[in-house]
């Protein structure tokens, strides 16, 4: 192209003519778009694995139906009753770049569930709510999870709440089916099909930690299970000081069973024997941790109404998960978070103007992901908004910013930086 283009310019051709001639020469032998030759080359390029410079192709779909129905009209003499259910169909379609799905043959996963919730006021100071839910994933046994909550009215506008909850989580689509070569290691799912694909039955893998500490332990590719959680929560919400002060506080304790995390195992490239830590094949694999893992946290929020429609607010929360060494938990929640705010929804001569300012801070923590790990630094942002009402049309004009000072931060390892977002909005017939 360059030789023909420069030759054309030197012979007196205008730029467009020289470019057209050079393009004709350069495109000789180039397959036409949509031709069999083009499709063949396209398919070869898109199947190049990530370590060799290729990319990911993910055209997966999720189809779902959710519904609920309030039966209280028919059951109010006994209690308030709500029933509901859902159905989901996952179609994993990556042409073998992310999942082990053959070309044009997506991997299907079907889930469905149903629930019933019953709420009853036993007397003027006690309300009970109980619910039960059943869910089924085609790759796992069905799960039933009950919950019960009590709301105790201590006095007017002052309530305590107690709850006992059970929950579950089926392994995600990637935890089941991911199959990604990242050059330094392979990231795979927990589906049993990987046993034969990577010959773990004839060429076993070994825990990386066991090879490092000299106590060699074989990894047996255990059956993948849903993780379950049992939790208890206590809370209080009330209005104090002539209903100017609102306090909302809670604390919780949870106990995970079969917690899903990731570990590293190593397999010999020679096909047998104890693998070498530095030269043999490393896999990141999902496991269910056999011991209970505990989580706990608390939070408190305070809102106070000042004269002339001013208000101030603050909330602080903490979340903690006790993770054993060597287990990648992907908890990815900061231990501490803080929000402070001041606002006024109507001030000025006609009480049409308003504003809100919010300060947000988040503690730093060690981020764990399937593709990258690392220290995530703490960050803080300032959000602000001003508004003006137009009573005749029941409209509001708003001008505001999220991260007003444009302090760049990122909230996950590998994510792009987030800067300021500035906006203007107009709402019509809102009040």
Where are these regions (language model features)?
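Membrane-embedded beta-barrel scaffold of Gram-negative outer-membrane proteins
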Residues: 1, 193-282
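Face-selective signature of the C-terminal outer-membrane beta-barrel domain
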Residues: 1-99, 104-140, 248
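Residues on the lipid-exposed face of transmembrane beta-strands in outer-membrane beta-barrel proteins
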Residues: 65-71, 114-120, 148-154, 234-238, ...
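Repeated loop/turn-to-beta-strand initiation elements of outer-membrane beta-barrel proteins
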Residues: 75-81, 125-128, 157-160, 242-247, ...
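Transmembrane beta-strands of outer-membrane beta-barrel pores
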Residues: 87-93, 112, 132-138, 166-170, ...
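Gram-negative outer-membrane beta-barrel transporters
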Residues: 124, 247-260, 265-366, 427
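Conserved C-terminal beta-signal and adjacent last beta-strands/turns
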Residues: 313, 329-431
